C-alpha cells in the first residue's frame, strides 16, 4: 500500500457494493452464486460452494463472508482451505468478466462520483474489487496519477488479482481455519485511517453496509462521531441484519 498524504483532504467518500449495484452492475453475491464461474466449482463437487448454493436458494439471499464463519464452526471438511482458495479464484474471474459498458450513467452512484471528481480535496475509500470507480474517474478526465492519489482500493482489485476476501479478524472460527481471516492474506496491510479521520470534516457513505467484516476500519470513525459529535452520519439499514453502526450510533 502506497503512502498517502492525508493532510490535503477535507472529506472522504466510503464506497461499498451498493455503489456498483446502483451503477447497474451484477456484483451481488447472489449474482456470483448464480454465475457460470460458480457453476464450475459446483461441477467439481466443491463442498463449500455446494453449501453456499443450498443456503442461497433457501434464503434467496446470501452473505458469503458470514456463511464462511458458519461453515467453519459447523462443518468438518478436510478440503476446506483448497476449496476456499478455489472460490476466491473464481470470484476474481467473475469480477474480471463484468461488462462495464452497461454502467448506468443516470444512476445516483455515477452522479455522486462525477460531481466529486471536480474537486481535489476528497479521498475515496473503495471497498469493492471492481474497476468501476477507476473507470468513471478516467471518464471524468482524471489522470492515472490523480486517481492513484485519491483512490484507495481497501480490499484490492480483481484486475490485479490481489483481492482480500474473508472474515474479520475477531470472527469466531476454528483455529485451523485461520486462512479465512483477512489479515492472513499476504497482500493484506492493515490501514490506519486515524490520521485521515482526524483531519477530514465530512464523511459520505455510499452503498457500504458498515458490516462486522470491516469493523476495524470504522471503529474510530463512529466512536468519535458519537463522543464528540464531530460528523453527522446517516445510514439506512436493512431490517434483521447485523451492522456495525447500530452498535455505536445510539
Regions found by a protein language model. Name each.
Residues 1-13, 17-202, 208-250:
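Conserved catalytic-core helix/loop/strand module for nucleotide-ribose chemistry
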Amino acid at each position: 500500500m502506497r503512502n498517502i498524504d492525508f493532510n490535503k483532504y477535507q472529506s472522504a467518500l466510503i464506497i461499498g457494493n451498493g455503489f456498483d449495484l446502483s451503477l447497474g452492475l451484477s456484483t451481488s453475491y447472489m449474482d456470483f452464486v448464480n454465475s457460470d464461474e460458480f457453476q464450475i466449482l459446483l461441477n467439481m463437487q466443491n463442498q463449500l460452494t455446494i453449501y453456499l448454493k443450498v443456503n442461497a436458494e433457501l434464503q434467496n439471499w446470501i452473505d458469503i463472508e458470514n456463511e464462511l464463519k458458519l461453515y467453519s464452526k459447523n462443518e468438518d471438511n478436510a478440503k476446506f482451505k483448497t476449496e476456499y482458495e478455489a472460490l476466491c479464484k473464481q470470484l476474481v474471474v467473475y469480477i474480471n468478466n463484468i461488462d462495464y459498458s452497461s454502467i448506468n450513467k443516470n444512476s445516483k452512484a455515477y452522479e455522486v462520483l462525477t460531481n466529486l471528481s471536480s474537486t481535489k480535496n476528497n479521498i475515496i475509500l473503495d471497498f469493492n474489487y471492481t474497476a468501476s470507480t477507476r473507470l468513471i474517474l478516467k471518464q471524468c478526465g482524471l489522470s492515472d496519477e490523480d486517481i492513484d492519489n485519491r483512490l484507495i482500493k481497501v480490499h484490492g482489485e480483481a484486475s490485479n488479482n490481489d483481492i482480500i476476501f474473508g472474515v474479520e479478524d475477531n470472527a469466531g472460527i476454528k483455529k485451523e481455519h485461520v486462512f479465512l481471516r483477512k489479515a492472513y492474506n499476504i497482500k493484506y496491510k492493515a490501514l490506519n485511517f486515524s490520521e485521515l479521520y482526524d483531519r477530514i470534516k465530512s464523511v459520505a457513505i455510499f452503498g457500504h453496509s458498515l458490516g462486522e467484516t470491516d469493523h476495524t476500519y470504522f471503529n474510530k470513525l463512529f466512536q468519535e462521531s458519537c463522543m464528540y459529535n464531530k460528523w453527522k452520519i446517516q445510514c439506512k439499514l436493512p431490517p434483521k441484519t447485523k451492522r456495525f453502526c447500530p452498535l455505536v450510533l445510539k
